[in-house]
């Protein structure tokens, strides 16, 4: 059985790790980096770039370069968060036929799971290159505050990438696993995991306990905001630069897509620099042009100014912290350790805010970029049966229920319930002789169903005619270990039942997923063909170079006919590598190889003759160095002489 890898599918960056025995290994990608930008670019020729290569070309290809797609996953186009992103993103966000938020690239609409699958495929390939074997199973992390639709969509992305997703686990929980197995001391401890990433914020209160030699990780509560992260911090800087430039130069950069992409890059860089220095220069020559000529942007940004720009964003993380503490029933004084996760947690102002709230210094010995992937790899080892000393008890982040008479949300499973879990409740009809009931499922904390997230609906039909309130309809909610919901309804009188796995009344259908899997496989096959063509071209080119060099040195030893034959074969290869026909390139390269055999024979004969001449001259030339070496007493000369003779 192959390894189960751990993948942190992040909004801004992604990371992959694997367990080797008792040690975790964060795997470097093909560029040698331990994290990969979650950026995907679609080229004109159909090539798909992922990671650093996609990020490098973003400025020149902004409309077809996708980033922060995780913020759209499992969301409806009409949601206010999506509408906010439409005005900010250089790429097009469109409504799918089912009402989901999709993206449009080069005239083609794509689902966020399909785009995220490209990043997952890169992570899969990274692991395969390191392990030297095929990888088919993974544990993928999601923000703890992701709802059912978002979890399901992440699982779909894994399938499209060719992965069997063994478990979806929450990012703070994964970070706690990494911390618990690496840094955790003796005895039971309560920890707070503050996870401020590129696009999402989570806070989880977790108890780590030693139960009969088994380390138990129990999530006491979780809270967060799935639309708050580093991307929002970048946007505050971009808005500031645009306002300053407009004030200074009278030009509005907000409508210039190319300029916006450069500003995005500069804002991210400035934000990172200001974590270590008090001031930075944002210098972008030729940012735009008007009738008077090119315009250059040069703005100084201080740490104090940045902090004032993002103060409200940092403050927004504190309310979920308060709620999580209250839900867990613990006071600040009972928290033993505060763990910081996510790239944004490196910002000094964020660290100060966390310290003020929890009344203690957060731990700095956990890598905020890698801890989540490491935790996922540990969970992979547990699921693979290689590790028996870890038990993970996670929770559902939001309450789940159904709509009942008057549009009320009747909660079946309350938030922060340990999963997996199952709960049943009996309901009845609202009207006389009602032949069917519609079960509408919602997720959220509001009292009225309409204020919560609709997850789906289904009907239970064939209820015998009877007065209202008489039929006994048992509704069962069952949440699996991935946090994904299954709902059933049963008429106790007739035994009729209907069950569904909640697929949001949007989401991808099975047919759509299968088509995307096939497209992904076709792309992989196409990529393989492209690589093979490149390799054939490289071999042909290397062969031409080698033969040319040999021909210059030994061509005069060949007769004219042989030389012409080789030159013609070289020309054929040079012509072939201008095209993309792999078989033709390989055939022409083989012809050149055969034609140049005579040249190889001449070279070999010439080298043998030289060696024979050198060996014959050896004894005569041996005396002088010996006498010199005695005079100079230099052993090195002897060694050199022996090397030549050999």
UniProtKB/Swiss-Prot annotation:
Residues annotated with Phosphothreonine modification: 200
Repeat in keyword set: no
Keyword Signal: no
Keyword terms: ATP-binding, Chaperone, Nucleotide-binding, Phosphoprotein, Stress response
Stretch list, region Disordered: 608-646
Pfam family name, one: HSP70
Stimuli inducing this protein: By stress conditions e.g. heat shock.
Start-end of Low complexity biased regions: 608-624
Positions with biased composition (Basic and acidic residues): 625-646
InterPro entries per the UniProt record, alphabetical: ATPase_NBD, Chaperone_DnaK, Heat_shock_70_CS, HSP70_C_sf, HSP70_peptide-bd_sf, Hsp_70_fam
GO MF annotation list: ATP binding; ATP-dependent protein folding chaperone; unfolded protein binding
Role this protein plays: Acts as a chaperone.
Record-stated family: Belongs to the heat shock protein 70 family.
Protein name in the entry: Chaperone protein DnaK
């Amino acid at each position: 059985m192959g390894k189960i890898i751990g993948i942190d599918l992040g909004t801004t960056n992604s990371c992959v790790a694997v367990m080797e025995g008792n040690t975790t290994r964060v795997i470097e990608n093909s560029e040698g980096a331990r994290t990969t930008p979650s950026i995907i670019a679609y080229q004109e020729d159909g090539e798909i770039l992922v990671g650093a290569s996609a990020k490098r070309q973003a400025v020149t290809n902004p409309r077809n370069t996708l980033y922060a797609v995780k913020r759209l996953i499992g969301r409806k186009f009409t949601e206010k968060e999506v509408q906010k992103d439409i005005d900010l993103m250089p790429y097009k966000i469109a409504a799918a036929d089912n009402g989901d938020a999709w993206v449009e690239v080069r005239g083609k609409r794509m689902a966020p799971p399909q785009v995220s699958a490209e990043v997952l495929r890169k992570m899969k390939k990274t692991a395969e290159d390191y392990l030297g074997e095929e990888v088919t199973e993974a544990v993928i992390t999601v923000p703890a505050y992701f709802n059912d639709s978002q979890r399901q969509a992440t699982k779909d992305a894994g399938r499209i990438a060719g992965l069997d997703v063994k478990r979806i686990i929450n990012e703070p929980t994964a970070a706690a696993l990494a911390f618990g197995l690496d840094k955790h001391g003796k005895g039971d401890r309560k920890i707070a995991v503050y996870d401020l990433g590129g696009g999402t914020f989570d806070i989880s209160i977790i108890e780590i306990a030693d139960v009969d030699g088994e380390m138990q990780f129990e999530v006491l509560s979780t809270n967060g905001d799935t639309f708050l992260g580093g991307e929002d911090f970048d946007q505050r800087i971009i808005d500031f630069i645009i306002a300053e430039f407009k004030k200074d130069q009278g030009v509005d950069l907000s409508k210039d897509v190319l300029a916006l992409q450069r500003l995005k890059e500069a804002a991210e860089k400035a934000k990172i620099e200001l974590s270590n220095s008090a001031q930075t220069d944002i210098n972008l020559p030729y940012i735009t042009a008007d009738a008077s000529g090119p315009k250059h942007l040069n703005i100084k940004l201080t740490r104090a100014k940045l902090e004032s720009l993002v103060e409200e964003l940092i403050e927004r993380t504190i309310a979920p912290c308060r709620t999580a503490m209250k839900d867990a029933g613990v006071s600040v004084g009972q928290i033993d350790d505060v763990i910081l996760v996510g790239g944004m947690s490196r910002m000094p102002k964020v660290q100060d805010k966390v310290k003020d709230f929890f009344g203690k210094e957060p731990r700095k010995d956990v890598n905020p970029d890698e801890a989540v992937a490491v935790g996922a790899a540990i969970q992979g080892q547990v699921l693979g049966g290689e590790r028996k000393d870890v038990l993970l008890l996670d929770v559902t982040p939001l309450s789940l229920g159904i709509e009942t008479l008057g549009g009320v949300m009747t909660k079946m499973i309350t938030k922060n319930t340990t999963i997996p879990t199952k709960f049943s409740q009996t309901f009845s009809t609202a009207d006389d002789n009602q032949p069917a009931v519609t079960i509408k499922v919602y997720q959220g904390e509001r009292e009225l169903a309409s204020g919560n997230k609709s997850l789906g609906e289904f009907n239970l039909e064939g209820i015998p005619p009877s007065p209202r309130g008489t039929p006994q309809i048992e509704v069962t909610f069952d949440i699996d270990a991935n946090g994904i919901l299954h709902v059933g309804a049963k008429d106790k009188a007739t035994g009729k039942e209907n069950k569904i796995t909640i697929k949001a009344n949007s989401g991808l259908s099975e047919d759509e997923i299968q088509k995307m899997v096939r497209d992904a496989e076709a792309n992989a096959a196409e990529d393989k063909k492209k690589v093979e063509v490149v390799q054939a071209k490289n071999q042909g080119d290397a062969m031409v170079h080698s033969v040319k060099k040999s021909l210059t040195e030994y061509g005069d030893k060949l007769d004219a006919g042989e030389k012409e034959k080789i030159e013609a074969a070289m020309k054929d290869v040079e012509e072939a590598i201008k095209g993309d026909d792999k078989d033709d390139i390989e055939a022409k390269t083989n012809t050149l190889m055969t034609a140049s055999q005579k040249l190889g024979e001449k070279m070999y004969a010439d080298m043998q003759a030289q060696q024979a001449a050198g060996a014959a001259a050896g004894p005569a030339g041996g005396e002088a160095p010996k006498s010199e070496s005695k005079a100079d007493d230099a052993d090195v000369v002897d060694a050199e002489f022996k090397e030549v003779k050999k």
